[in-house]
Amino acid sequence: MSTPAIPQDLQLNPSQRTQSAFREQRRQKLKEHLLKRKTSFACKQENQMLLSDGDQRVRTSEGQIQEGKKVLKIKTEMADKENVGRPTGIKNNLTVEKNCIPLKPSNELTNSTLATDPPNSEDNNQTLPLLPVKDDPQSQHRTLSQTFHLKNNSKKKPVITEKPKHDANVPKKPVLGAYRGQIVQSKINSFRKPLQVKDESSATTKKLPATVSKATKPQPGDVSSITVKSDRASHMTSTTKFASTTSQIRHLVRPPIRSQHNKAQDAMKPGNSRMSANVTVQKGPREKELNTVLSGIKTSSSQDIKGDKTLSKSMAAGMVVRPASSSNTKLIEKSKSAGQRSHTTVKAAVDSRWTQPKETAEERKARLSEWKAGKGRILKRPPSSAVTRPEPETQNEQPVGSFWTTMAEEDEQRLFTEKVNKTFSECLNLINEPIEEMRHTIVDILTRKSQEKLKFGENIEETSAAEEKIQEAHTDDTGVDLESGKLEMENNPPRNVFQDCEKEQDDKVKDPTSDVKTPSTNTRAGCLIKYNVSTTPYLQSVKKKMQFDETNSAYKELKFLTPVRRSRRLQEKTSKLPDMLKDHYPCVSSLEQLTELGCETDAFVCRPNTALCGMFSEPDPTEEE
């Protein structure tokens, strides 16, 4: 079977890869890639060999660079539309290779150890040996300018490290009279009087223990060795100053005393600077440290003494032209006293610096008060105690008067509290143990009330007997009696509920048929009326108000009596009900039940219930013991 012919619309254009130009281009690319790998491999091998030797520099072969240039020319001549941006990238890569390969060993200057002496550090044009290090990954990408700066920095480092560290023993607080590390005699003379010292050697020996203790102070653990610093520079400056002063004195025939004194002060400055030089010792045993420190201090002190002697000799030689007078001797004495003062000031500064930590808080306060007194900052107080003597007397008189007034107030308060406590105790005793007189009064009140009720019942019987004895007429008579009783309740002052309760009981005893004709006749026969005994917060507040009234002081509690309707059937079964379903407040139907509840000393207020009969519709508050 033959393959079907593809229509012209669906045929693809012939690929450009089949063309000879593109094949040649791909062949050149492959050759370039292989050459690149070959050169990189050769460079790696050379680097490894140079690192193992440690003394040879890495150099690139000129043949490899020429081959790279040829490949670059071929790339630029080819016009490839698909790879327009490629030649520039390859060119950059080749230039990076060309620049970075010969400069590889120059970056080891940072990690190389250079052993150079300070005298030889002046030769800036000397070439330093290069020690290649494997640990520096950035060494492969450094330019010529970077290597040049690294060389200069490496040459400057030893010079910087050899500079003396003057900050090691400089005190934290500035020394009085010092200017730029040197003590100026003119500043000292402005605020300090010259101290009398026998000779200079005694001052230097006194300064010895302070410097020894400072030199033997423990250094940090990582410091391996400390170099002893020399005073060559200071000696040179001192000699030059001596020469200049002597020459000036010889030229002047009659120099003024002021200028000579200033020159003597200038000549003493190098000696002072020598005394304040730092003396440090190499790490070792304590005995060696002490010996070296002692020797250094002795040499410096002897040099100072020699300098002072030469100064005095030169001054004397310069003044030979002028006739001998007392001014020359005064000048020499002044120069000596200036030297002695400089030594004593250095010693005083050192001593004060070492004695400050031992000072206690009390000494500081005393020193502060003295300083304030010197400055005139003390609080002004009365000048004499004689003026202030009468003041305590007046102050004592005032408390005496206030004492008697407070005593009187305390007595009044005590009497008042005793009276109040007495009244409270009497009230409590009356509540707990009532007096017989009170009981008799209560009984009299109850009997009088009962007699009134009996009379009221007899009147009812007389009226009922006068009327017809028919049952209907009897019922009419009872209705009239009830209406008349209602009118009496409206017209008369409010009465106690106990009267109503006793009246009901009397009616029940005298006429058993009257139960049907009570106000509860309107309700069903299965219900009965009782009085609920309850209290409210309002009653408690009323009771507190009533306690202040003497007439009602006998009442213990104040409660409400409210008529309520209860079911007979449920009342019979209340004993079987749980406590949750029972009434929280007790209900009574007679005076005897109230006495059983222990409410003999309570006062009751009748609260009407509008849901029941009309007789309870109007509020009739009554109170009774």
Curated annotation (Swiss-Prot):
Modified residues (Phosphotyrosine): Y538
Modified residues (Phosphoserine): S190, S534, S541
Bias kind Polar residues: ranges: 1-22, 107-128
Locations listed in the record: Cytoplasm, Cytoskeleton
One Gene Ontology term from the biological process aspect of the record: negative regulation of microtubule depolymerization
Basic and acidic residues: bias regions: 159-170, 359-373, 500-514
Ranges where the record places region Disordered: 1-27, 104-138, 153-173, 195-237, 259-282, 322-398, 484-521
Entry-annotated residues carrying Phosphothreonine: T518, T521, T535, T536
GO cellular component: cytoplasm; microtubule; microtubule cytoskeleton
Keywords, ordered alphabetically: Apoptosis, Cell cycle, Cytoplasm, Cytoskeleton, Microtubule, Phosphoprotein
Subunit structure: Associates with alpha- and beta-tubulins.
Protein role: Possesses microtubule stabilizing properties. Involved in regulating aneuploidy, cell cycling, and cell death in a p53/TP53-dependent manner.
UniProt family annotation: Belongs to the CKAP2 family.
Protein name per the record: Cytoskeleton-associated protein 2
UniProt source species: Bos taurus (Bovine)
